[in-house]
Amino acid sequence: MSTYNKFAKYLTMMAVMLAAATACEDVDDDGDIFSVQPDGQIIDPDAPGVDEVSPIPLTCYSARLETPALKDGIFIEHSTFERDDSLVNYMLEYSPEHFLPRWVAFRFDARNRAVTANRKSYDIKPQFPADPDLGSKGLPGDASFNGFQHGHLCASNDRRNSREANDQTFYMSNVMPQSGNFNGTQWVYFESFVQTKGRSESFADTLYVVKGGTLDDVRQNISVAGHTVPVPRYFWMALLRVKGTNYSALGFWVEHRDNYTEIPATEINPMILEHSLSIDQLETLTGINFFPNLPDDVERTVEASFSAAAWGL
């Protein structure tokens, strides 16, 4: 993007955010990068005269229900254009220290739950392009994970509503090192559970999803494009279901091992239940504050425990 266009987008964003908080979802919808400040504010590092620019309050994307409390990473939002309107595809907080996402957040709702696009062709190279919003702070396209696979967080199958939406899930900022065994069996069971629930209008009006892996509790460190990158010891998911005025939440905590095997369909839900926990418990394990934009009383209630029956488990 040219300097002129970035500056124009920056001025537009300022105007919209000052005009009305309800309009701010239309700000910066092609996913430009912002640095999260310790006080929860952001600045656009590409804006002209950035040293003189006052931080912009994160009143927009950080206010969405799926967005966890931000830390000191790089906040990125990727959007697509659907039916002449912008649509948030997913968001993430990137850790430049680890060259991996701290988390990736997205939602299933009436606008994106349709399945109309196929998976990106394996013939397209790079298969996993560099995130265009990270520049030198991110990993290069198709950077090898040295024996580990590129494990999606926002899965390819999570975003089948358009070609652009699916393609964006292949950015290097949306993948973490996963063993082929884990990526092809155990993780798929949890991904499929989320996709089935997210695409069911009878189950949820909106299903909010956050996924990640542990960056400090690791199996090992590997060298990727000259950088030290951790291989998470655990992967996790945080889910929030909204149906009418009813809220329920659920967490998953799954060890990243190499010895998983395929299991019969009748054993999948019991296995998922064994790895389920409350959001409060997941927050303790990850150090991440999930769903902080819920009303306080709702947040306390839905995060304290989970109902297996509410999730069909």
Please tell me what each predicted stretch does:
Residues S2-L11:
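Bacterial N-terminal signal peptides that target proteins for export
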Residues M14-L18:
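Alpha-helical transmembrane segments
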Residues A19-A23:
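C-terminal motif of bacterial Sec signal peptides marking the signal peptidase cleavage site
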Residues C24-L313:
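Domain-level detector for secreted/extracellular nuclease and nuclease-toxin modules, and
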